[in-house]
UniProtKB/Swiss-Prot annotation:
InterPro entries the UniProt entry points to: Pantoate_hydroxy_MeTrfase, Pyrv/PenolPyrv_kinase-like_dom, Pyrv_kinase-like_dom_sf
Enzyme class, broadest EC rank: transferase
Biological role: Catalyzes the reversible reaction in which hydroxymethyl group from 5,10-methylenetetrahydrofolate is transferred onto alpha-ketoisovalerate to form ketopantoate.
Principal localisation: cytoplasm
Organism field: Hydrogenovibrio crunogenus (strain DSM 25203 / XCL-2)
Reaction it catalyzes: 3-methyl-2-oxobutanoate + (6R)-5,10-methylene-5,6,7,8-tetrahydrofolate + H2O = 2-dehydropantoate + (6S)-5,6,7,8-tetrahydrofolate
Protein name: 3-methyl-2-oxobutanoate hydroxymethyltransferase
A single MF term (Gene Ontology): 3-methyl-2-oxobutanoate hydroxymethyltransferase activity
Length: 261
């Protein structure tokens, strides 16, 4: 998979299927099911390491898990998160991206935030590093803002749209929108030329992403409203992953009950 192909999929209206993976076997079976983008997310802090948030995840953790994923990912585009406090300044962002790309073999790095990270996105883009932005609910900011839908009021919606445009202008090649009203997600998607991947953002983004553990019903505690346990109606993990891919491609997922705003 290439960025060029992902952009062509957006232009053609073909849904992009993204899924998190944290180790080799997960990556292998995701690709076998037809997943086109693998996100090595700092969500591993919660679903793999058992933390309450993503904040304890280190850059070393991210490099380690990205390495494992890439050993068995021979087809999907791989995005790796730059973890909390590894984007304190331009120097730390460049160092973090270099490790994720060189040691982890990631194809792209992801940065959370809007205006705060525009300069960093520009610098990475100028150096030829593919960058994915992340707006809406920002897991790395939960200590301050909590888990809540973003962009429900007109002012915050306008700010998110403006920040999305700023990220694209700075050189972002892709954008994740998390927990924003479906109508706002549609508006942002239509206003950008780069692929927009949604999670809890309705069905009119260019693609969808879910955490693997939610797809397989492995969530500890209450599962997010925007998620679906595909294993409950399947006879194997492989079948569940195939069904997730099929439902995203056909538009069956997400359904109205998975919208959060």
């Amino acid at each position: 998979m290439t960025l060029t192909k992902l952009h062509k999929m957006k232009q053609a209206g073909e849904k992009i299927v993204c899924l998190t993976a944290y180790e080799a076997s997960q990556a292998y079976w995701a690709v076998e099911a037809g997943v086109e983008v693998i996100l090595v997310g700092d969500s591993l802090g919660m679903v793999v390491q058992g933390h309450q948030t993503t904040l304890p995840v280190t850059l070393n953790d991210m490099v380690y898990h990205t390495q494992m994923v890439q050993r068995k990912n021979h087809q999907a585009w791989c995005i790796a998160d730059i973890p909390f406090m590894s984007d304190m300044n331009l120097s730390s962002v460049l160092d973090s991206a270099a490790r994720l790309m060189k040691e982890g073999q990631a194809n792209m790095v992801k940065l959370e935030g809007g205006q705060r990270v525009v300069e960093m996105v520009q610098a990475l883009s100028d150096l030829g590093v593919p960058v994915c932005g992340h707006l809406g609910l920002l897991p790395q900011s939960v200590q301050k803002k909590g888990y809540q839908v973003a962009g429900k009021e007109a002012e915050s919606a306008a700010r998110l749209l403006g920040e999305a445009k700023m990220l694209e202008s700075a050189g972002a090649d892709m954008l994740v929108l998390e927990c924003v009203p479906a109508q706002l997600a549609k508006q942002i998607t239509q206003n950008l030329s780069i692929p927009v991947i949604g999670i809890g953002a309705g069905h009119e983004t260019d693609g969808q992403v879910l955490v693997l553990h939610d797809v397989l019903g492995l969530t500890i505690g209450k599962a997010p409203k925007f998620s679906k346990n595909f294993l409950s109606e399947a006879d194997s993990i492989q079948t569940a992953l195939y069904q997730y891919v099929s439902d995203v491609k056909s538009g069956r997922f997400p359904a109205s009950e998975h919208c959060v705003g």
